[in-house]
């Protein structure tokens, strides 16, 4: 099957966010961010667990106040996934959450303060073996850079990132990753391209403030897809004005489409037409809902007629080709004698998929099947 990604990843150094490896060929980590009030511990913990259930490798939590920092301490104790504390304006909050076991500190160089304050955060991170993400954003560039460039440009984002990379270099601190996010696709893509040529540290990708669920997913897929196809990127976050759980799903779908990292069922399904012998759209929607718990990578083709069905089935782990009253079933590209009753196709196909998943899982020697 033609399912190996031709993408050659950009070489980068290795850091760890908790127990999650970042860079140097590690699987691209998918993360999201909570949108609850951090001081609402119960709601925040519930959302973090929901994100973890759909595969989040890392979760970022905004910590805007000292009260939020105290809440973060409790949240950290009640969750398992590595947590990144998002810090703006007050560097002392970064020092506080470091005491509470944060797995990574995200600071925005445009508003965290002067170099001495950054130095305090860096020394604390070094002492506690905590990595840092330098988060540059086109919407919060330093005033002098806006005066110089008049508007966010790739060169402005690069200069902002590099001045803070230089600070970390002078402090002999190399456990960091960098992001240069923007809401404009071309601005973000070119900024990342420039940065990728300047440093060896891992890059965290994102199109910031991308929009609602549909438009934001499309914008992120276009922008991040361009970078990932060039081998750029070690972690990613899809920024949607939607349920954060959707960010994780979209993130994995982007990686899955590029054959970089697969998680769960990859459905190959026709848009359907008058030739379909069963309701393709309803079948796919129901199977997606039922099989959300599956993490084992698997290609399943569901085609409503014999025009493209056999060809797609040949390169799928499981294939279904629409037929009159009964549809053809393929396993590993081989047509089986068994045929599926079109009226009960969802139940029959779900059973076959789950049986094959169980068979594959039994052969996998590692517990991390997503890598």
Curated annotation (Swiss-Prot):
Its cofactor is [4Fe-4S] cluster. Pathway: Isoprenoid biosynthesis; isopentenyl diphosphate biosynthesis via DXP pathway; isopentenyl diphosphate from 1-deoxy-D-xylulose 5-phosphate: step 5/6. [4Fe-4S] cluster binds at residues 270, 273, 305, 312. GO terms for molecular function: 4 iron, 4 sulfur cluster binding; 4-hydroxy-3-methylbut-2-en-1-yl diphosphate synthase activity (ferredoxin); 4-hydroxy-3-methylbut-2-enyl-diphosphate synthase activity (flavodoxin); iron ion binding. Keywords: 4Fe-4S, Iron, Iron-sulfur, Isoprene biosynthesis, Metal-binding, Oxidoreductase. It catalyses: (2E)-4-hydroxy-3-methylbut-2-enyl diphosphate + oxidized [flavodoxin] + H2O + 2 H(+) = 2-C-methyl-D-erythritol 2,4-cyclic diphosphate + reduced [flavodoxin]. InterPro entries: Dihydropteroate_synth-like_sf, IspG_bac, IspG_bac-typ, NO2/SO3_Rdtase_4Fe4S_sf. Gene3D superfamilies: Dihydropteroate synthase-like, Sulfite Reductase Hemoprotein, domain 1. GO terms for biological process: isopentenyl diphosphate biosynthetic process, methylerythritol 4-phosphate pathway; terpenoid biosynthetic process. Its EC number is 1.17.7.3. Binds 1 [4Fe-4S] cluster. Converts 2C-methyl-D-erythritol 2,4-cyclodiphosphate (ME-2,4cPP) into 1-hydroxy-2-methyl-2-(E)-butenyl 4-diphosphate. Belongs to the IspG family. This is 4-hydroxy-3-methylbut-2-en-1-yl diphosphate synthase (flavodoxin). It comes from Shewanella loihica (strain ATCC BAA-1088 / PV-4). The gene is ispG.
